[in-house]
Amino acid sequence: MIVFNNVNKVWPNGKQVLKNINLEINKGELVAVIGLSGAGKTTLLKTINKINDISSGEILIDFDKTKEHYEVTKTRGKKLQKLRQKIGLMSQEYNNIANKTVLQNVLNARVSSQKGINKILGFFKREDKMIALNSLDKLNLLDYAYIRADNLSGGQQQRVALARTLAQQPFLIIADEPVSALDPILANQVMKDFKNINKKDGITVIINIHHVDLAKKYATRVIGLNNGEIVFDDVPSKLDAQAMKKIYGE
């Protein structure tokens, strides 16, 4: 569970981008965050793993499976590193290494599990290779394992990025505009991948997305932000014209 209690974020220039955010996100939800550019969507997501510090309030994270509890605002050092290992982070950039194979790119998620000379030389244990291959298999990408990343389409590269995130074995995935650069067919495929991972693996997914139609189609819950405030928080079927007006204005 993720809990936001009276969270505010003010930039050094005085602009307030998050205003009194009170929110609970439960394990197994697929949450789409929508709103205009500058509404605070990216800032909200990046407070979860403390890429962005908050100005006031608190963020609490409980991982039921491991019985671990984090008060994000007070988490730092090795404990913050441990928290971030449990949270997969994706963006619209694929962040693949162009001249490396798909498998090598996915294996990068396992670097933190390596020690000593293996970490220095980039050697991976058989267990890590199996985790990476299993992640590719879940996305039907095994046939691409030994193909260089720069030979793939944009949609395929984003799916490789998702496979890499899966290989991290996260409890939570936060994705910032993961389909904004994709055509409608590929965007649907990537969203379908998120949905399958959410349902089959029980991984909580929070996606910042501009495509309202995709949010309604794939999310179990939609949160609408307007000028840093939550103005809508409900199931997709309740996202009617009145709700859209609250989120996007006239």
Swiss-Prot record:
SUPFAM superfamilies: P-loop containing nucleoside triphosphate hydrolases. Disulfide bonds: none annotated. The keyword Translocase applies. Coiled coil: none annotated. It is a peripheral membrane protein. Keywords: ATP-binding, Cell membrane, Membrane, Nucleotide-binding, Phosphonate transport, Translocase, Transport. GO terms for molecular function: ABC-type phosphonate transporter activity; ATP binding; ATP hydrolysis activity. InterPro entries: AAA+_ATPase, ABC_transporter-like_ATP-bd, ABC_transporter-like_CS, ABC_transpr_PhnC, MetN_ABC_transporter-like, P-loop_NTPase. It holds the Pfam family ABC_tran. Residues 2-247 form the ABC transporter domain. ATP binds at G35, L36, S37, G38, A39, G40, K41, T42. One of its GO terms (cellular component) is plasma membrane. PROSITE patterns: ABC_TRANSPORTER_1, ABC_TRANSPORTER_2, PHNC. It is an enzyme of class 7 (translocase). It is found in: Cell membrane. Its EC number is 7.3.2.2. It catalyses: phosphonate(out) + ATP + H2O = phosphonate(in) + ADP + phosphate + H(+). The complex is composed of two ATP-binding proteins (PhnC), two transmembrane proteins (PhnE) and a solute-binding protein (PhnD). Part of the ABC transporter complex PhnCDE involved in phosphonates import. Responsible for energy coupling to the transport system. NCBIfam families: ABC_phnC. Belongs to the ABC transporter superfamily. Phosphonates importer (TC 3.A.1.9.1) family. This is Phosphonates import ATP-binding protein PhnC. The gene is phnC.
